[in-house]
Amino acid sequence: MSQSVESRTRIKSERYESGVIPYAKMGYWDADYVIKETDVLALFRITPQPGVDPIEASAAIAGESSTATWTVVWTDLLTACDLYRAKAYRVDPVPNVADQYFAYIAYDIDLFEEGSIANLTASIIGNVFGFKAVKALRLEDMRMPVAYLKTFQGPATGLIVERERMDKFGRPFLGATVKPKLGLSGKNYGRVVYEGLKGGLDFLKDDENINSQPFMRWKERFLYSMEGVNKASAAAGEIKGHYLNVTAATMEDMYERAEFSKEVGSIICMIDLVIGYTAIQTMAIWARKHDMILHLHRAGNSTYSRQKNHGMNFRVICKWMRMAGVDHIHAGTVVGKLEGDPLMIKGFYNTLLESETDINLPQGLFFAQNWASLRKVVPVASGGIHAGQMHQLLDYLGDDVVLQFGGGTIGHPDGIQAGATANRVALESMVMARNEGRNYVAEGPQILRDAAKTCGPLQTALDLWKDISFNYTSTDTADFVETPTANI
């Protein structure tokens, strides 16, 4: 009894003094906090303003992303305030960087509505990124408790079911984005789809910004694209698909387009990240109900994920999108034209594909994560890749990926079908070499040259793009190892 009185007295004297007191003193810092299995954990990279103690800055982030405001409020006493306060429990300096710190924060599960990415993000990234106490702030990683994950649907279809529907096993999926992304008529667009699929690709896809413009309305695109899919499937004797982008201005429009895509026989539809978390979850629920694969283009992500000191690491987006329920997400190529450190991208892929992940600091995984049996998301590698890189792509990314060669198919001098054939032959020759036990990474260029002896389109592709690489040092690399972007 005496301890209870003493505890209440301490809380009242330290936590509920009127006016403005430090966040750490208000209880948002607790170095002795014992993490619960049901806690949501977040890791922030903080850059405090000059003169701001990193512990106080961490406590401020914990407070402002949970229950605090700038001054003490007596209405906290009407809540289970000790439970609901987020707790910053650990602060580490960032290796080899001055004035940056990793702040570990724990949130009670009851702070979040079940099954809502929108509610989760309203707290975790809602106000704190504009907080004056920090010069910059970045959300690096999160751990979701199993109890919380069980309130989410997860991927509508998942990798295993997609492979069964497509009847494609033992190799990556092959795809391409229609180019140019804007300006084609419906008939010409459908011709591109047909040529690419007939040449050997599994998928063609719309790009992120093709919706329903004056040069080609959405229904026209859907009809001509599916005509191409059906003709190519019949000619090749394989199951083929085209990602029909149903992104639109309103949910009503997206529903209409998605339902029409189903009516005309598509097995997959597509949305953009920019439609927002609630719309993404809504379309994922629709996709599962209608047995459709749901592809997500990460349009817009680099506006907040690329810079190392402020914004949000893409691995967090990967986690949220697996919870939200998409089946595909663009997650980097390593060797292509877009940002992508090898270790960082490996961390993204593991986040999307593994049932459990352990702490792996070189890959940027700060927490162990049990995915509570949520289905796997298929990563998509797209942007500046070509047949001559096939050994690198297979080595870095493995089998469970969609390799999308847009320009690397449609830019082929002998035509779209030839470009698709070059990519299919390159992939199958590399997979065969791997399955035979050869060192396909070291022997990759020779394996491709040998395959090209009986495949003219592949020889043309190798000659055309042999000197093309995008070997820049990534802006976002692991803090615990030096890993320049590799393009051998």
From Swiss-Prot:
Transmembrane stretches, start-end: none
Cellular component aspect of the GO annotation: chloroplast
Superkingdom of this protein's organism: Eukaryota
Subcellular localization, as worded in the UniProt entry: Plastid, Chloroplast
Binding site for Mg(2+): 205, 207-208
Cofactor(s) demanded: Mg(2+)
Cofactor note (record): Binds 1 Mg(2+) ion per subunit.
Principal location: plastid
Residues the UniProt record annotates as site (Transition state stabilizer): 337
EC number in record: 4.1.1.39
Oxidoreductase in keyword set: yes
Keywords carried by this UniProt record: Calvin cycle, Carbon dioxide fixation, Chloroplast, Lyase, Magnesium, Metal-binding, Monooxygenase, Oxidoreductase, Photorespiration, Photosynthesis, Plastid
Family note: Belongs to the RuBisCO large chain family. Type I subfamily.
Self-association state and partner proteins as the record states: Heterohexadecamer of 8 large chains and 8 small chains.
PANTHER family tied to this protein: RIBULOSE BISPHOSPHATE CARBOXYLASE, RIBULOSE BISPHOSPHATE CARBOXYLASE LARGE CHAIN
Name the record gives this protein: Ribulose bisphosphate carboxylase large chain
Organism this protein belongs to: Pyropia haitanensis (Red seaweed)
